Structure formats: structure tokens, C-alpha cells
């Protein structure tokens, strides 16, 4: 299974929903990076994703996007293939 990295923030309902969806898909561990605690992490997230909002989700080296993008990927049947290439 690919490594899953998620940039998150405090009190983020979309972060919580994304974590639940990923755990339901069989992801046992998510590398969570809190951008509120580190300006460097926020800058890194922006550089890698081009976005300023959380969550930003990466599966392996692939930038999935936010929760809506992750949900769409799951609904279209592409999440499992990305998690288990």
C-alpha cells in the first residue's frame, strides 16, 4: 500500500472526513502534517499542491487534492488502484 500524507489543520471537519474515508478504504496509517503548527509545513504544502486550504492529500507521490477530490476518486473507483498499484 502506498504511503498517505495529509496536510491538516485544527478544527477541520473535511480533514476528519478524509481520515475516515481513508481508514474505511483500508489505510492503517496516515502521515499527518499540521500546517497550523509550522509555517514551514504550510509553505511546503503550498509548494507541493499549489493550494492554501486543508486537507491536502497525497497518495505516494500523487497529489489527490482535498476531501471532495478524494471522495470523487473513491466514488469513481480509482482510490483502490491508487492506494494499491
UniProtKB/Swiss-Prot annotation:
One of its GO terms (biological process) is cell redox homeostasis. GO terms for molecular function: protein-disulfide reductase activity. Disulfide bonds join 12-15. InterPro entries: GLR_AS, Glutaredoxin, Glutaredoxin_subgr, GRX_bact, Thioredoxin-like_sf. Its main location: cytoplasm. It is found in: Cytoplasm. One of its GO terms (cellular component) is cytoplasm. Coiled coil: none annotated. PROSITE patterns: GLUTAREDOXIN_1, GLUTAREDOXIN_2. Keywords: Cytoplasm, Disulfide bond, Electron transport, Redox-active center, Transport. Residues 1-85 form the Glutaredoxin domain. Has a glutathione-disulfide oxidoreductase activity in the presence of NADPH and glutathione reductase. Reduces low molecular weight disulfides and proteins. Monomer. PANTHER family: GLUTAREDOXIN-2, MITOCHONDRIAL, PTHR46679. Belongs to the glutaredoxin family. This is Glutaredoxin. It comes from Neisseria meningitidis serogroup A / serotype 4A (strain DSM 15465 / Z2491). The gene is grx.
Amino acid at each position: 500500500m502506498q504511503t498517505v500524507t495529509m496536510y491538516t489543520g485544527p478544527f477541520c471537519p473535511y480533514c476528519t472526513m478524509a481520515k475516515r474515508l481513508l481508514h474505511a478504504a483500508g489505510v492503517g496509517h496516515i502521515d499527518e502534517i499540521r500546517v497550523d503548527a509550522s509555517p514551514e509545513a504550510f509553505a511546503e504544502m503550498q509548494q507541493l499542491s499549489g493550494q492554501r486550504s486543508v486537507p491536502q492529500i497525497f497518495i505516494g507521490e500523487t497529489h489527490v487534492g482535498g476531501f471532495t477530490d478524494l471522495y470523487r476518486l473513491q466514488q469513481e473507483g480509482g482510490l483502490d488502484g491508487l492506494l494499491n498499484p
